[in-house]
Design a protein with these regions (language model features):
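Short, well-structured segments within or immediately adjacent to enzyme catalytic domains
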Residues: 1-194
């Protein structure tokens, strides 16, 4: 936003149903008032991603830029590497009962179910590292041609985009959310959900 590549309006999805997310109409491009050092500011700190403590200005989740995932924050041109997209629900875990992986949603009333598709499941747009966008209708895919896999203890396993799989050996799995706190370790990061 600060460099003028995108307007702040793009940060609000037209399909977003969370009333706490709104366009930042007062984004300051020069010497923002909320900056610690206004002359050296590289962005407007009043642009807020956290919609859990008042109004936020960002609808979209992005891959956590940390650990093994950090290398994926570049032009890898991989068609299965999700990098940004509509927010998803918080995932409690992934179940392999019956021989098929299924994501277990923590809150069955997640606001993210209201944004697209049927009201009892998640659907949304996901942008990938090769610059294409797909409309995705599942939280966990099963086709290696279109869905990313990570190296788990049991071998290659399909990745759930909104879950940080604990058995990921290299910490390269795709984990997407809006993050309000970062740190040197994955445990120091705070993801928010609705």
């Amino acid at each position: 936003i600060f460099n003028g590549f995108i307007p702040s309006e793009i940060c609000l999805s037209p399909a977003d149903c969370n009333a706490n997310i709104e366009v930042d109409k007062d984004y300051e491009f020069a010497q923002p008032k909320t900056a610690v050092n206004r002359e050296k500011a590289l962005w407007d700190p009043s642009f807020n991603a956290d919609f859990t403590k008042g109004k936020g200005n960002l609808s979209y989740a992005h891959m956590q830029p940390h650990g093994g995932r950090l290398a994926r924050w570049s032009s890898t041109y991989q068609a299965t590497e999700a990098q940004v997209g509509n927010r998803g629900p918080e995932i409690a875990g992934v179940d392999a009962a019956g021989g098929k992986l299924a994501a277990k949603v923590k809150d069955p009333n997640s606001v993210t179910f209201l944004n697209h598709g049927p009201r009892e499941s998640w659907e949304g747009n996901i942008g990938y590292a090769d610059a294409h966008v797909d409309y995705v209708t599942t939280l966990l895919g099963d086709d290696p041609k279109v869905w990313d896999r990570y190296e788990g203890r049991a071998g290659l396993t399909f990745d759930c985009y909104f879950y940080d799989e604990p058995d990921d050996v290299n910490k390269r799995n795709i984990f997407m959310s809006i993050f309000t706190k970062a740190g040197p370790e994955s445990k120091d990061w705070t993801a928010i959900w609705d």
